Amino acid sequence: KVNTVTEQYDVAQAKLVMGFRVGASSMEEMQHARLMCLLFGGTPRSKLFMNVREKLSLCYYCSSRLDRNKGIMYVNSGVEHENVEQAKEEILHQLEQIKSGSFTDEELNETKLMAVDSLRVVNDSASSMEGWYLSQMFLHSQASPEEEAEQLLKITRDQIIAAANRVTLDTIYLLSGEDK
C-alpha cells in the first residue's frame, strides 16, 4: 500500500516528493542502487531531467537522490498544480523504463563517469574528506573515494536493472496550494 500525504499551503507551484524503498540487502546492492538512482534522476542527462523536465515540461525541477543510510530513494519535483497527476505517472514510467532495460550503454557510461568525477573531488578539501569518511562510518564501510569509484565502474547493465526492480513506491507527498 502506498502512503499518500497531501498538505495545503499558499504556494505558487506544487511540491511533489515520492519516496521509494530500494530493497538493497547488501552494500554491493546499495552501490547498484546508487548508480541506478543517478541514471534515474541524479544527473543533467538522467531519465527524469531529460524526459519529465525537458521533453515533457511537466516539472520546473525533477531529480532523485538516494539516502544510503535509510535505503530510501527520493524524487523531488516542483510541478504546476494541474500537472501533478501526469508528473507522477511519468516519473513512475521513467522508473519502469530502467526496470525494463530501456537505457543505452552510452547513458550508463555517462552516468558512471559523472559519478566517478564527483568522487574525484572529495580529496580536494579537508571538509569533503571529513564528510566522506563520516558517511562511510555510518554505512559501516571503509572504502576510499577511489575504491568507491572503482566499484561503480564495474557495475553492469543487469545489476542496474536488478536494482531498479527491487525499488518499490512507499510514499507520495504533495504540498499544494489548491484544494483538491
Predicted regions and their residues:
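Mature, solvent-exposed C-terminal subdomains and processed small-chain segments of exported/organellar
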Residues: 1-74, 78-180
